[in-house]
Amino acid sequence: MNAILPKISTLPAKPAPTREWLAGIDLLLAKRYQRTALMSSKHFGPLRVQRPFYPEPDGCCHIYLLHPPGGLVIGDNLHIGASLQQGAQALITTPSAGKLYGAKGASEKQGQQVEFNLAAESCLEWLPQETIIFDGANGTLSTKVNLTGNAQYFGWDIIRLGRVASGEPFNTGTCAQRLQLWRDGLPLFIEKTKFEASSNMHREKWGLQNANTCATLTATLQLTRDSIDEMLEALAQLGVTNTGEWGLTQKESLFIVRYLGNSITDCRKGFEFIWQQTRAVFNGKPAEVPRIWRT
């Protein structure tokens, strides 16, 4: 007897292949003699460090993270990790903006996870370029910093929604952002933000007010009220307060700066100014601007 074959329409559909491009890097830095050495750099995919730089006399290690693709499409995932041993000092930055590209009707996500672990007496400055969220993106961004003892951290996260100047506003899509700072297992700062183009939060005055640039700077330093007032006046004289709103807040052992506006240039300029003005308070030495910012 011949077997009865099922109709083609009743056969289970072959699952569509998922596109996924993973990349990651884990750095280990330790104090060796008179400078901080990059002890190991374990990576997979297109994410790596070319070589460490030492532009400062105290041996602080400057690291440029290179990601040749330049951005993440739907399905991509990027992991950045660094561990600093006792007494290590490092400044980590990126040569260009990160990008989360969009795709119509995408159900998969793309994302970047950053995690730093700092031992006692270590110091990390995380100063990346901005991340651009393209129209139609479906992204997640996470930054977590674990501090031990008297470890110090200075970092910022800058979000650019769409590319208005290029006629590509952020009309559709979403991106969930999470920022965390912990010291000895206790939270210093935890914040969750969801950038959703169609939401009231994106449009209303109590939310983003249709601004296309949103940024947060956090630093484990203590400033006086007078110092903060003087810094606000200096930002105004610098000409960066006309395109957005600035908020400077001193919490217990944590200094927080926020920018909400429409100029990535003014945001970067203001953040760099604050970093240069406070670095001596933060780690006792003048700012040494990474050369890659000027190329």
Curated annotation (Swiss-Prot):
Keywords of the record: Chaperone, Cytoplasm, Nickel insertion
One GO MF term: nickel cation binding
Pfam families (alphabetical): UreD
Transmembrane segments: none
Function: Required for maturation of urease via the functional incorporation of the urease nickel metallocenter.
Family of the protein in this entry: Belongs to the UreD family.
Complex and partners: UreD, UreF and UreG form a complex that acts as a GTP-hydrolysis-dependent molecular chaperone, activating the urease apoprotein by helping to assemble the nickel containing metallocenter of UreC. The UreE protein probably delivers the nickel.
Cited PANTHER family: UREASE ACCESSORY PROTEIN D
Protein name: Urease accessory protein UreD
Native source species: Saccharophagus degradans (strain 2-40 / ATCC 43961 / DSM 17024)
Lineage: Bacteria, Pseudomonadati, Pseudomonadota, Gammaproteobacteria, Cellvibrionales
